[in-house]
């Protein structure tokens, strides 16, 4: 038995609860299981270490002994007084298959390496218009499919998997550790109860090969940037007939040239001429549904916010719809003709002294006078 600390092996504190230990074990067992890491000796060793740690820490009496005596509790020359624990053999032995049955829906205590497929996470980029109105997208995801040479059996065509010679088909073996007799997953067949003597040359005994699957994603109207869509059963395929995992699609919304989104509302800048700002007028403004008319009142200043009701984004969870807010920017004309310059100069002359026509300028001058008086 390895002398590595069992708690460190599972990555839990010494005060960890039974549920925390079980959760940590499940995660590591799935990560390092030989079926998921074929021909990976390092993963196989890690899997064995995780097994040993869980076999001890999942049993209250064994855990108590380990907490008190460490690894010496399971060695022949350990502390005295352990004879009373001889009952760990036989029916009270550790059944490694139980935990896998709970994890993956197996039946009896026999170890069942039927792993639910992994969840798959992918991202997709859509336009603001698509996010506002909803859209269907087709995406390609990496997956596995049954081997077309062996039809998923993993065995060379013309042959069949044989009963495992090590466990005789039970999927488990018994090992003796000092005074303890424990049951664990068969190291030869990894709990399947069968052994492939002549593996398929294409899938090398796995029964499946890498593939690409096309999935249609229904993106609902009103979805926001960063939200996820879950497609049940569209993730990685299960092993040996277990259910597939789920597919999680994270939505990213491409930056728009005109609009910025804030929840259900949209915002945009609306440039207007200084003549329209002074006299008022009617303008066409863009929305996600096309152009609409907007009346600009006279004497409008830069920074004024005008609302176009109901031209925002539809709510994902209710019948509400946001609004469009146009932020006015009064533009100073450039590249003036001589005639335009003459008219502006004339306008400036006849406006001199009419401070009530420029309230912000008057307020600024009043503040200057107060500052220096």
Swiss-Prot record:
Residues annotated to bind Zn(2+) 2? 164, 167, 186, 189
Cellular component terms per the entry's GO annotation: cytoplasm
Question: Which cellular compartments is it found in?
Answer: Cytoplasm
Q: Where are the zinc fingers (CR-type)?
A: 134-212
Q: Which Pfam families match?
A: DnaJ, DnaJ_C, DnaJ_CXXCXGXG
The residues bearing each CXXCXGXG motif repeat, given as ranges, are: 147-154, 164-171, 186-193, 200-207
Reply yes or no: does the keyword Chaperone apply: yes
Every copy of the J domain together lies at: 5-70
Q: Which residues form the signal peptide?
A: none
Q: Which HAMAP family match?
A: DnaJ (MF_01152)
Q: What is the role of the protein in this entry?
A: Participates actively in the response to hyperosmotic and heat shock by preventing the aggregation of stress-denatured proteins and by disaggregating proteins, also in an autonomous, DnaK-independent fashion. Unfolded proteins bind initially to DnaJ; upon interaction with the DnaJ-bound protein, DnaK hydrolyzes its bound ATP, resulting in the formation of a stable complex. GrpE releases ADP from DnaK; ATP binding to DnaK triggers the release of the substrate protein, thus completing the reaction cycle.
Which protein is depicted?
Chaperone protein DnaJ
Gene source species? Neisseria meningitidis serogroup B (strain ATCC BAA-335 / MC58)
